[in-house]
Amino acid sequence: MAVPKKRTSISKKRIRKKIWKRKGYWTSLKAFSLGKSLSTGNSKSFFVQQKN
């Protein structure tokens, strides 16, 4: 017979949510940094053809 699981505590829920949000923050920061370096021409990982 199926037994319902115990409730996740509020503190555990907040910790998991914070970890999830922090991952998104760092990903967006890296993407912004890469876009900034591409726009200024200082990128070392991408080669962008310049249009004259």
Curated annotation (Swiss-Prot):
GO cellular component, one term: large ribosomal subunit
Pfam families linked to this entry: Ribosomal_L32p (PF01783)
Keyword Secreted annotated: no
Keywords of the record: Chloroplast, Plastid, Ribonucleoprotein, Ribosomal protein
UniProt GO BP: translation
Family annotation (SUPFAM superfamilies): Zn-binding ribosomal proteins
Superkingdom, natural source: Eukaryota
Protein's cellular compartments: Plastid, Chloroplast
An example molecular function term from Gene Ontology annotations: structural constituent of ribosome
Keyword Ribonucleoprotein recorded: yes
Family that this chain belongs to: Belongs to the bacterial ribosomal protein bL32 family.
Name of the protein this chain belongs to: Large ribosomal subunit protein bL32c
Phylogenetic placement of the source organism: Eukaryota, Viridiplantae, Streptophyta, Embryophyta, Tracheophyta
